[in-house]
Amino acid sequence: MAGDVKFGVAMFPADYAVEPPALARLVEDRGFESLWFPEHTHIPASRESAWRGGDELPKQYWHTHDPFVALGAAAAVTERLKLGTGVCLVVERDPITTAKEVASLDQLSGGRFLFGIGAGWNQ
């Protein structure tokens, strides 16, 4: 039905958090539409722009799994759940490698990948 509101879950998949496959099963079983993982491959040595949450970056920024690997693991254990990057930092990536990862994840997930992109906040 047009106009139906759909809800998703976003979290930092980190080495100390719930594993992506277990989280994906829980999210799908509870009827959510989507699961979103961010990308944080580069920790700035210095910052000209403040992080909006305070002075220090939270622990999860230092321990975040690669979103394509984590979403691939989530895709392997789900059937309907849409899987997205929230967001992929495309300006920090090789475009050919990124295109290959996006196409692979979308194909292996049966077309369930949602490609959220951005540039990040640090100047």
PLM regions: where:
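N-terminal beta1-alpha1-beta2 module of alpha/beta enzyme domains
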Residues: M1-V77
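Generic, ordered loop/turn and secondary-structure boundary motif
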Residues: H42, V69, C88-V90, N122
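Hydrophobic residues within beta-strands of alpha/beta enzymes
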Residues: L35, L83, F113-F115
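Flexible, glycine-rich active-site loops centered on histidine and acidic residues
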Residues: A2, K6-V18, V90-Q123
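Conserved catalytic cysteine-centered active-site region
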Residues: T78-G86
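Short secondary-structure transition/capping motifs
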Residues: K59-H63, V87-D94
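Solvent-exposed polar/charged
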Residues: A76-E79, Q107
